[in-house]
């Protein structure tokens, strides 16, 4: 989604250029809006260095404004058709906490191996064909892949080009199947009524629901709009844990210590209805326990949102939050 023209973006650009010079087939697809998070965009530098680069859904021409909200939020990298990377991380300096950036962002990204890598590649190839007209096919892009372990995984490519709401149905299905526990982190939390109801019903069935959120969101209007829903869920028995800075951009969900959902999707209208997203569901107890350990570390640093009238906020803030909640489909 985002590929910034900063120190780390330029390091990626240089590495990609060296790969292209070695004869590696390199294709880079950046969302048109995501490419403009830093100006000048890094697209020109990539193209001038010999890296085949394209912008997804260019929407700045007046006759294309109606497509402005349809963004590719996917974060996919595939190497030699055999090793994949996906999760929540963009290419920008703010993700490198060791450099002490001015606006640090904590995130979680995964390396993926085995047959599921072909599903990452298919999602990219489909977007590349749509954008450029070039078809990526053959063993260079899709080599034969063999199982490497016991985990069962499936890629979930979702977007507004389909009538079947895959991400929403996966989330609803996971909540309905949960028997003991559900833990998840989502930086932007604006679930629709179906998901709100599913969370409440899971609590009534005795499922322990824990939601991890940053105390301060990098998008203020989203933070305000999310507060009424979080307080409503806290009153219904969900445990809401708010973590201190840095801002946590992690997107991951664990159910019953056996199922993990990872990828780019948030619990908000953009991910559920407007964006092109890519997630991976994994049935693997070892991975689930590892992710839960990370989530437990986050929870240990945070504080629980206490349910109750006002939750200590002045009434004017409640009015502001409720008003912004009305606009959540547009945030």
Map each language-model feature to its residues.
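Charged, low-complexity intrinsically disordered terminal segments
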Residues: 1-331
């Amino acid at each position: 989604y985002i590929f910034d023209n900063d120190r780390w973006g330029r390091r990626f650009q240089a590495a990609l250029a060296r790969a292209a010079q070695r004869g590696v087939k390199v294709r880079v697809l950046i969302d048109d809006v995501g490419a403009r998070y830093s100006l000048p965009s890094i697209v020109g530098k990539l193209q001038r260095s010999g890296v085949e680069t394209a912008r997804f859904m260019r929407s700045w021409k007046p006759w294309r404004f109606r497509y402005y909200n349809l963004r590719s939020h996917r974060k996919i990298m595939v190497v030699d058709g055999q090793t994949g990377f996906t999760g929540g991380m963009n290419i920008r300096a703010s993700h490198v906490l060791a450099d002490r950036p001015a606006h640090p962002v904590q995130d979680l990204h995964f390396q993926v191996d085995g047959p599921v890598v072909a599903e990452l590649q298919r999602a990219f190839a489909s977007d590349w064909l749509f954008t450029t007209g070039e078809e990526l096919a053959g063993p260079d892009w899709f080599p034969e892949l063999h199982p490497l372990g016991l985990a069962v995984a499936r890629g979930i490519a979702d977007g507004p080009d389909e009538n079947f709401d895959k991400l929403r149905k996966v989330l609803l299905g996971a909540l309905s199947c949960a028997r003991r526990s559900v833990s998840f982190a989502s930086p932007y939390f604006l679930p629709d009524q179906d998901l709100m109801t599913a969370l409440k019903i899971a609590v009534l069935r005795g499922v322990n629901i824990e939601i991890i959120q940053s105390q301060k969101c990098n998008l203020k209007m989203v933070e305000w709009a999310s507060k009424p829903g979080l307080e409503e869920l806290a009153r219904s028995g969900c445990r809401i844990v708010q973590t201190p800075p840095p801002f946590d951009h992690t997107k991951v969900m664990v159910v019953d210590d056996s199922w993990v959902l990872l990828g780019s999707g948030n619990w908000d209208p953009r991910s559920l209805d407007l964006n092109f997203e890519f997630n991976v569901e994994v049935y693997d107890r070892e991975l689930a326990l590892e992710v839960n350990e990370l989530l437990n570390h986050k929870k240990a640093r945070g504080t629980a949102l206490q349910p109750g009238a006002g939750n200590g906020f002045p009434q004017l803030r409640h009015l502001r939050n409720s008003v912004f909640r009305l606009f959540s489909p547009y945030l």
